[in-house]
């Protein structure tokens, strides 16, 4: 007789507030304040002497894998990357402290967005115990001070529902478009070239790339090509040419990620367990442009 209780209490989430989603003032306020939370410079050129772009990409990929394995809310990873970039834009940091900084940023973002946030002990385990919980807690205060406790940053996820609501999409397709757009946002967060893009542009480009990638199904959208881009640009007051360029860059990043995944899959030296680990954002392998 099995006495072990296997019940798992579901995570409690607030339902979407229609009053907020249908009030254009909310979207306008997001557009007004979003640039306050961007890094102030391309910090590899003028601030960081020890950290290189590939190091940032490695720690961002590690952070994404941790968030996926812990089934964090979609907003946690981009928000943590926002903290990381803003800190690095102002504070010269040794490369030996980069993973510690990434862990602290996830720690803070999960406190803001998760019902049950990540613990310091769990994050230390993900670093193979190369950092101690007390060290993480001490650095938490350092990061908070440098960010001036300004943690409620605007991220691309804040725009997704506002954009989807204004598109002439079949309701049954919205969840798939949303899922793909969230994947693109995660991909953008791992690539520094998007670090200084406004969140609204990343969100708009991600939605556009998601719809274009799903247009193999004729019923996905009543808008295509330039008409779709024009509508998306109008929703978020984005320059059309800038939006097209952003969407093209997102698609290139996706293709590079897919190619890397296929190379890893074909590498006979990798074990099946290694291949099963999340090395690309959720469902990237299921997306076809």
From Swiss-Prot:
Record-level Gene Ontology MF annotations: cyclin-dependent protein serine/threonine kinase regulator activity
Gene Ontology terms describing biological process: cell division; G1/S transition of mitotic cell cycle; positive regulation of G1/S transition of mitotic cell cycle
PTM per Swiss-Prot/TrEMBL: Phosphorylation at Thr-280 by MAP kinases is required for ubiquitination and degradation by the DCX(AMBRA1) complex.
Positions where Phosphothreonine occurs in the chain: 280
CC per GO annotation: cyclin-dependent protein kinase holoenzyme complex; cytoplasm; microtubule organizing center; nuclear membrane; nucleus
Location of this chain's protein in the cell: Nucleus; Cytoplasm; Nucleus membrane
Segments forming domain Cyclin N-terminal: 26-151
Positions of region (Disordered): 264-289
Sites of Phosphoserine modification: 271
Described purpose of this protein according to its UniProt entry: Regulatory component of the cyclin D2-CDK4 (DC) complex that phosphorylates and inhibits members of the retinoblastoma (RB) protein family including RB1 and regulates the cell-cycle during G(1)/S transition. Phosphorylation of RB1 allows dissociation of the transcription factor E2F from the RB/E2F complex and the subsequent transcription of E2F target genes which are responsible for the progression through the G(1) phase. Hypophosphorylates RB1 in early G(1) phase. Cyclin D-CDK4 complexes are major integrators of various mitogenenic and antimitogenic signals.
Family: Belongs to the cyclin family. Cyclin D subfamily.
Subunit-level organization: Interacts with either CDK4 or CDK6 protein kinase to form a serine/threonine kinase holoenzyme complex. The cyclin subunit imparts substrate specificity to the complex.
PANTHER family: CYCLINS
Protein name per UniProt: G1/S-specific cyclin-D2
Organism: Bos taurus
Gene designation: CCND2
